[in-house]
Amino acid sequence: MKRILLLVVVLVSIASIASAWSPRHDEAAVILATKHLTPRALAFVKDCLGDSYDDDVAYLYKLEKGHQSPYSKSVHKLHLNTDLTPKNVDGDDALKGLEQALEVVREHEKYSSFEVIAALRAVINLMCDIHNFANVCIDGVPHSQGDFKFQIVGGRKGPSTAKWSTFFSSYINFHKGFSATYWAEDFEIYYGSEGMKLANGTLRDWVAQIGAKAAELYATNHPDREMPLRERLEYEPLAYEMVASTGYRLAALLNEAVK
């Protein structure tokens, strides 16, 4: 019975899919992760998802985008208490689904190949959902409970309206000539040997860090706010840090799960 319930949760978890992924934002994180998988973890991933591994393309992301199963367009939310600990909620929650999917990956010999593939895909998708601040719902922070629009002022073309859910992805997407592979390599060079330190601690430690940074942004950003362009540019390093930390954390999770 436990196995049936777990499979149901995993299948629900993989509902957030292509439209929820930024073309380069999440892809760059996954490409970065593939660069830091152990030989055993990489072999496991290739065995689960196919034989067409291409060093120049994010393998996991490529398989994810090319999958033909009908998925919903929903995005999974991360629910946190005021102290940034995980909130126990009924129904869908990104962290809950991620932890349960990881359990299947760790115990993959006990499950069918279908169950393991579903779990692996869920891990990838849910990690990308969690690091987007627009998906972080924090008790006591009302503006974190849903998407909203705000205005950026001070640009050459006058005020522009943006959605909070695309706030971080807009930094990478702004540089249209740079591929996701370029961004992953850029993060690799920038962080160097220090990169995996972004994955220090437990998964829940990482989630709390995401929550803390999200709370800081929500404290000053709200619906219909006029954000000066200079301030928006000040957030750019934070956006890149979130992408990089997601890639390194994803690699650490898979390396730990597949020993």
Model-derived segments and their meaning:
Residues 19-126, 133-259:
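N-terminal, motif-rich segments that launch catalysis or mediate targeting to/interaction with membranes
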Residues 4-14:
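Sec-dependent N-terminal signal peptides
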